[in-house]
Amino acid sequence: MITRRALLGFIAVSSISPVFAADHPSIAFMRRFGKDMLAAHRLGTVGKFAGVIEAYADVAGISNYSLGQYKPNLRANQRSRYYQGVVTFMSRYFAEQSREYRVAKYEIGEASVDANKDVIVASKIYLLSGQTYNVRWKLTWRNGTYKIADAKVMGFSLTYLQRGLFTSYISKRKGDVSQLVAALTR
């Protein structure tokens, strides 16, 4: 026989499930992002991708993370130029990839909360070639809205890969971040 205490305990545990329903704001955010990203993908221009990245990505967070140990070397007067350079870098990457990986459609799956209180949203990307990719999006809360902090494709973090590229570039230039800023803003 189920006791009242057991039933109340089950209800309490069930109500704090880490998986969000389809109407959760993080899912609505990802639906808007998906629609805009697919439109950018179909157009394939750097400018269209830049608009989507500026609207939905945590540009400052991604940019700062990408500097790794060289973050203290970024001067305050370089910051906005660097952030814009990162947007351009990511936009060029996505525009280039859009030619090779033609997306037919996407599905937004469930969202859950990780140990750092970030929201992780699962998605599936369907290519025109018939291939599919699972992408896990990490969302963070910034200035009253969700922002994309990372995407993992086949288990590989895009921000981690970008960090590797940037820190390697800076390392070869003896820690001079201004050379990276100049390269990103050409």
Describe each region flagged by the PLM.
Residues S17-A21:
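Sec/Tat signal peptide C-region and signal peptidase I cleavage site
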Residues D150-R186:
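Low-complexity, intrinsically disordered terminal/linker segments enriched in charged
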Residues R92-Y133, A183-R186:
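Surface-exposed, charged secondary-structure patches
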Residues M1-A12:
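N-terminal secretory signal peptides and thylakoid transit peptides that target proteins
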Residues T132-Y160:
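Short beta-strand edge/turn micro-motifs at domain boundaries
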Residues D23-S98:
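Early exported N-terminus immediately downstream of N-terminal targeting peptides
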Residues F10, Y82-G85, A183:
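Generic alpha-helical secondary-structure signal
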Residues G68-K71, E100-K105, S168-I170:
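Juxtamembrane/interface motifs at transmembrane-helix termini
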